[in-house]
Amino acid sequence: MNIVGQKIYDWAVDLFPINRSLSGNGVRQTLQYIKNIIPELEVNEVPSGTKCFDWTVPQEWNCGDGYIVDPDGNKICNFKANNLHIVGYSIPVDKEIELEELIEHLYYLEDQPTAIPYITSYYSPRWGFCLSFNEFQKLKKGTYRVKIDSELKDGSLTYGEIKLKGRIEKEIFLSTYVCHPSMANNELSGPVVTMALINFIKLLKDRKHSYRIVFIPETIGSIAYISRNIDDMKKNIIAGFNITTIGDDRNYSYIPTRYGNTLSDKVSKHVLQDIDYVE
């Protein structure tokens, strides 16, 4: 692994344990980590309830702990062991229930029996736990204690932005997501590679184009950002790329624009044809 690759990997290792979501302290902690490496990053907050076109910024969610205690006293689905165990945006709960009721709040993947699924419920208040199908099959009848120490409150959605000026005002737009918890490909691959790209762009001595780069929560973060910057974006952006799920061992790929012949499309095809692009 080269020096840049090692740095990218080290950043991912540091960021992996953080519990990120659409909002909350995990996103702030992630952006602060990035800012420590890239001081030019500006962190912005959009208050809960803010109208963004026909969407509304949701309440802020934070989770401190969560687990299930089985009939034998064993603690399972422990949030502190793996933050994927808690359904994202779960409402708080602390009660004893029977297995039959518990099952209604459990999520697993039969076709991937060792995997813990990633489940969220951003806009429908509920609580739930995620576990591997192998662990699910071990559950037996009896009384279980379920506890999720979470909080939903009016707060804000957080995103980071950096602008790198070039000789002209026309911009290349890059975005990447910072809202998934402990997942490497879908999502951390995007932010850490984007960090490396920023460092590379900063070293270019004669940049023709300017660059606008954002670290945002998926969907609502994009909508919130565009709603606040639409005039500048329409005026200056000539190409844009969303950098996500680029950490697996499959071929590089891109999703074409609706038109198929924009500058973004042409650049992507030109670059990918020299790597592993197949028409």
Model-derived segments and spans:
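N-terminal hydrophobic/helix-forming segments and targeting peptides
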Residues: 1-279
